[in-house]
Regions:
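Non-catalytic, substrate/partner-engaging modules appended to enzymatic cores
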Residues: 4-376
Length: 376
């Protein structure tokens, strides 16, 4: 009961970069990513030991990117930028809190020379090892939306709580693709040149190409799941050009995002990758938030999906991309700790929530609002 979709069938889906999983009417609100309206705090992966050779700094910064912060700290301490540890990149246009590590013997130089008002050290600790990229659980967000009426604010809250329970597609946000949203084209050209990557900029461009292909694949899977959810078995089978028996099995899955044989899944929020062999069993685990399907970030040394699931992945897999390590990314995530507070007089809605590492607050807001936040 396998599938072998025509290449054309898949390419039709590729026209849709962003497909929303939820079907409610779009909401109206004003979003701006500014230091006054966008707050994010990094949640560390582990508790620091408070002993060891590395100074751990909990830093609040505003109107400053992580790259700029590292440059400022390097200048203040005399360290090379590569010797300053961080877990993830934070945007410039926000008020952010993140953790940084430096060798503790440079603490005196830091105290003496760090003078900018844009950087505030909130806490200090020590650890036996430096912070490395990826060493975070996730991020806690607090965002203020403007020009939202009370009715929409209530519906926003209800929808956000529903998404906390049922989950959302884990698209990369528009920030990943540069100001003109076309950085992935440069990345594709670099990736397919076969040349070794030069510097962090080329790596960033190639990773944008990886992310673009992933978003295309995810949009196709969301569209596919929408067709199954919104049509009877016969209609869905015709629209997808799938065997009716397969669609019947897929339609029995309670969750929105349908799993296929061979889908690469990982225990949520972390664990060892495995492949779907029994759709019913995996569907139950998915419903219980025990596992989540993953999408391909094509590159070197990465596991591909298998069987039916790979037919759906193949159109978004660039086997020429070997200059950057590949990976798999959760396709479906569950926001946590969702809270809202509405200010009637100012028509403002304060939204607080937590997302796992690598997930975008703007993606969550776009799924609720049903419109792009880019260039608002």
């Amino acid at each position: 009961m396998g599938i072998c979709p025509h290449k054309y069938d898949i390419i039709v889906f590729m026209n849709h970069i962003k497909n929303y999983a939820y079907t409610h009417t779009p909401l109206q609100f004003d979003f701006k990513q500014t230091v006054e309206r966008f707050f994010v705090e990094e949640i560390p992966l582990y508790t620091f030991t408070n002993t060891g050779n590395y100074l751990i700094l909990k830093i609040q910064k505003s109107n400053m990117s992580t790259w700029k912060l590292i440059t400022v700290l390097a200048k203040a301490t005399g360290l090379q930028e590569r010797d300053i540890g961080y877990a993830g990149l934070k945007d410039k246009n926000a008020t952010t809190i993140q953790y940084i590590s430096i060798p503790k013997q440079y603490e005196r130089e830091l105290n003496k020379n760090l003078t900018t008002e844009k950087v505030v050290i909130l806490e200090r600790s020590y650890n036996k090892a430096p912070i490395k990229i990826g060493h975070l659980k996730g991020n806690a967000f607090s965002i203020v939306l403007h020009h939202i009426n009370e009715k929409d604010a209530k519906f926003f809250t209800t929808t956000a709580k529903k998404m906390q329970k049922e989950g959302i597609p884990n698209y990369y946000g528009y920030q990943r693709f540069g100001e003109d949203s076309r950085s992935y084209l440069q990345g594709k050209e670099i990736a397919q040149s076969g040349k070794r990557l030069k510097g962090s900029k080329e790596k960033l461009l190639v990773s944008a190409y990886q992310s673009y292909l992933y978003n295309k694949w995810l949009g196709q899977r969301v569209k596919l799941s929408t067709i199954i959810a919104s049509n009877n078995t016969l209609q869905a089978a015709k629209k997808l050009d799938y065997p009716e028996e397969l669609v019947k099995v897929l339609a029995k899955q309670v969750q929105f995002f349908k799993l296929f044989i061979g889908d690469a899944v990982i225990p949520y929020p972390y664990g060892k990758l495995s492949f779907v062999k029994d759709m019913h069993q995996s569907s139950q685990a998915f419903l219980q938030k025990k596992i989540s399907p993953t999408g391909l970030l094509c590159g070197a040394n990465v596991e591909r999906a298998k069987s039916d699931a790979y037919y759906l992945e193949e159109a978004y897999d660039d086997t020429e991309l070997n200059t950057l390590k590949g990976d798999r990314r959760f396709a479906w995530i569950w926001p946590k700790d969702v809270e809202t507070k509405y200010e009637c007089n100012g028509k403002k809605l304060k939204v607080e929530f937590y997302l796992p590492k690598g997930s975008y607050a703007t993606t969550f807001l776009e799924e609720i609002g049903k419109f792009s936040l880019k260039n608002m």
